[in-house]
């Protein structure tokens, strides 16, 4: 069957033909290719078209598709176990690995997704502090938990909606909105509500309004305010954890969070999530404390095995991060040079192996308001050109592009060649 026929039939059985909205390509006005296989950085659709992949399952596949060691670990465990709903040594192994290798995580609780991790961390913060209010930042996405679906970045921006139907005002009345990288605004917010704020949740490297790194003095301000008012600082490292550095985005700042959430890379490509922090806080979770959270598939042995294989490989090959940094810099520099050559207004934001090309004529993109000024129509033309040229990119101006250890200079150079063709066409259109 052709891709378009499969997608058309999918629309009869799944809302929008997909199980997560951005996959429908609605924002770029195209039909998505239907992917059937992947190895390394090459994925293949049902018509046997091949694409160089810069989405990598939205970030988890830092080792590339079907890494041999990860697949072998999955095979080995799946021959003995699928699920128990009981303690296993594998979950201890992964928990111990994370707690001994990361700075600020003394205890950890496994869950099944990034959304579960963030919503559970917020519940824990509320239970620990006995307060209700949570601060999130405009443009940051922390999953589809009701309390977060306000000013939530890519998912709702791409769909052209401010939030989500089905979320009553009561669900968000205790959510306060901060402005990313704005010290003065967050300080004023704390002056007004500080003694009611249970916690502040932030992507230290935002990825769902495009890639924007928190500024050092802004992060220090958050830490100081949380200390002053007795609130918890929660880092959402679902996307940045183990990606921008082995120890994640928190290693890029001289700031310690109280709680951290993980997913994506830590599951090796399988459904996974976790949240952790100081023992003093984590011991408030049931069965030790009064904050209840549970899950049938939490700590699933196959997922734990995939996570252990992935994280061990990253720890034992720290040069992987050097490689990703080098090819990322090559891609960034190439895009900037080509854009200047053809008078194409762009801003490139990159932190390690995650980056966003903003079609924006500002000098820098550092806030959600800056992101809103992007030329979405130009992005859509760029996306279509690159897809036809054999590149799988995020189908949204407001998402991150990802690199893996399997990307080579030849893949980057091929990308830049296709991008230059696009830039030339845009230049001709403007004449």
UniProtKB/Swiss-Prot annotation:
Its cofactor is pyridoxal 5'-phosphate. Keywords: Cytoplasm, Isomerase, Porphyrin biosynthesis, Pyridoxal phosphate. The keyword Isomerase applies. The modification N6-(pyridoxal phosphate)lysine is found at residue 264. InterPro entries: 4pyrrol_synth_GluAld_NH2Trfase, Aminotrans_3, Aminotrans_3_PPA_site, PyrdxlP-dep_Trfase, PyrdxlP-dep_Trfase_major, PyrdxlP-dep_Trfase_small. Pfam families: Aminotran_3 (PF00202). GO terms for molecular function: glutamate-1-semialdehyde 2,1-aminomutase activity; pyridoxal phosphate binding; transaminase activity. Its EC number is 5.4.3.8. Pathway: Porphyrin-containing compound metabolism; protoporphyrin-IX biosynthesis; 5-aminolevulinate from L-glutamyl-tRNA(Glu): step 2/2. It is found in: Cytoplasm. Its main location: cytoplasm. GO terms for biological process: protoporphyrinogen IX biosynthetic process. It comes from the Bacteria. Homodimer. This is Glutamate-1-semialdehyde 2,1-aminomutase. It comes from Clostridium beijerinckii (strain ATCC 51743 / NCIMB 8052). The lineage of its organism: Bacteria, Bacillati, Bacillota, Clostridia, Eubacteriales. The gene is hemL.
């Amino acid at each position: 069957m052709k891709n378009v026929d499969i997608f058309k039939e999918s629309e009869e059985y799944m809302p929008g033909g997909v199980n997560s909205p951005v996959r429908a390509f609605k924002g770029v006005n195209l039909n998505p290719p239907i992917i059937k296989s992947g190895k390394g950085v090459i994925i293949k659709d049902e018509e046997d078209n091949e694409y160089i992949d810069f989405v990598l399952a939205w970030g988890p596949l830092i080792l590339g598709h079907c890494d041999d060691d990860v697949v072998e670990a999955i095979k080995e465990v799946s021959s003995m176990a699928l699920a128990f709903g009981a303690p296993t040594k594998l979950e201890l192994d992964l928990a111990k690995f994370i707690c001994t290798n990361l700075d600020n995580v003394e205890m950890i609780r496994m869950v099944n997704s990034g959304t579960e991790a963030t919503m559970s961390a917020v519940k824990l913060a509320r239970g620990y502090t006995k307060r209700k209010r949570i601060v999130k930042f405009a443009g940051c996405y922390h999953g589809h938990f009701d309390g977060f679906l306000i000013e939530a970045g890519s998912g709702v921006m791409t769909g052209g909606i401010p939030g989500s139907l089905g979320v009553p005002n009561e669900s968000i009345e205790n959510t306060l909105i901060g402005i990313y990288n704005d010290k003065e605004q967050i300080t004023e917010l704390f002056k007004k509500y500080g003694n009611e704020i249970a916690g502040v949740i932030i992507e230290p490297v935002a990825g769902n309004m495009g890639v924007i790194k928190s500024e050092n003095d802004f992060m220090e301000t958050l830490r100081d305010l949380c200390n002053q008012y007795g609130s918890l600082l929660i880092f959402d490292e679902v996307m940045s954890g183990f990606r921008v550095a082995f120890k994640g985005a928190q290693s890029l700042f001289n700031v310690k969070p109280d709680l951290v959430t993980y997913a994506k890379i830590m599951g090796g490509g399988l459904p996974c999530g976790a949240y952790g922090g100081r023992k003093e806080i984590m011991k408030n979770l049931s069965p030790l404390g009064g904050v209840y959270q549970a899950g049938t598939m939490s700590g699933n042995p196959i997922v734990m095995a995939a996570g252990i294989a992935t994280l061990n490989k990253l720890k034992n090959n720290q040069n992987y991060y050097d490689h990703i940094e080098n090819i990322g810099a090559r891609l960034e520099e190439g895009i900037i040079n080509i854009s200047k050559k053809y008078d194409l207004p762009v801003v490139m934001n990159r932190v390690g192996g995650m980056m966003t090309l903003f079609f924006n004529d500002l000098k820098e993109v550092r806030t959600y308001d800056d992101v809103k000024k992007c030329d979405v129509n130009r992005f859509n033309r760029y996306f279509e050109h690159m897809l036809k040229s054999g590149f799988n990119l995020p189908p949204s101006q407001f998402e991150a592009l990802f690199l893996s250890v399997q990307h080579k200079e030849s893949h980057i150079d091929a990308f830049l060649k296709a991008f230059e063709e696009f830039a030339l066409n845009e230049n001709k259109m403007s004449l």
